[in-house]
Amino acid sequence: MKRASGVGHLVPFLPGLGSLLEDPEVSEIMINGPANVWVERAGKLEPHEAPGLTGAWLHRAAIHIARPLGLDPATRPVLDARLGDGSRVAICTPPAAPEVAITIRRFGGRAFSAEDLVRMGSLPEPVLEAARRTLLARRNVLVSGGTGSGKTTLLNALIELLPEDERIVAIEDTLELRIDRANCLRFEAGATHDTPVSIRDLVRHALRHRPDHIVVGEVRGAEAADLLQALNTGHGGSLTTVHANNAKSALSRLASCAMQAGDALPWEVTCRGVVDGIALVLHTTRREGRRFVEEALEVRGYDAAAGRWATAPVWGGAAELPEEAKTHTPKEVHA
């Protein structure tokens, strides 16, 4: 993906929003129109008054962002861009929207370690230890959750549990992970390449680069089949994420994605591949402005006759929790 200027370059084009663009507590700015601005600060949504922001200013901002990409909002009313500082911008202009709409997702200042997340109350200590054991045993972890639930933050923290002297190949649709490793090869998919490159293309290609561990930022489609094959053929200690409503549905979601492959195996066989490929599922959620691991399951098997996953709770749900954990109140993760 091509890059426009950093988020600081937008300040002159967005009157009344300069303080937000410079506030490290602000993770997302949502401009629905000149009189309808919302901001996510410390995990909570709140309205923001920007009296000087007009439709004309929003139009200028859209042009300023699009021009370095060789695009024109007049002919391309829906576009995505990554700014020079890693922040992401989504723009929608008329006629696709009543007014110019711009959403800015700021790139975080630093990555949180697993220990940081434990201290914040976002990652229970038993879950961290289960993840550590799983990865060091060269078994694989699936992180699930909804949009904005902290999946990427958790994934980034778990990567740091991998041995320092081993090679990581990370594959993302948009570069968001902050991986501080010398021997890490990063791939980015995208439709803006002259020759479009998909996540599935990159998962297949990654195997030629001798990875000890494969990290896929998010599985959405047929690439799940290739990833499961890799996980089941010697690339243990790998990680990925998937959108799902709970930990068990994450397993079904991963299997469903794998079934989208043109050469997909039967459902029962695919589910057995998920069982062989995934040892631990960590489900994240966001509630009342807080992001935290709500549930963790060990994957034990799949009952084809009943159509059910066999799992063992590690945290949440039916897990045996200490009394203090039952009243656990997680704090916010700003990422």
Regions found by a protein language model. Give the residues of each.
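N-terminal anchoring/assembly modules that precede and organize ATP-driven motor systems
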Residues: 1-47
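Active-site phosphate-binding and catalytic loops of NTP-dependent enzymes
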Residues: 12-19, 65-82, 166, 261-268
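P-loop NTP-binding catalytic core
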Residues: 23, 40, 46-137
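Conserved P-loop NTPase
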Residues: 98, 273-335
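Switch/coupling sub-region of P-loop NTPases
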Residues: 141, 157-277, 283-285
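The Walker A (P-loop) glycine that initiates the GxxxxGKT/S ATP-binding motif of P-loop NTPases
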Residues: 145
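Walker A (P-loop) phosphate-binding loop of P-loop NTPases
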Residues: 148
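Conserved lysine of the Walker
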Residues: 151
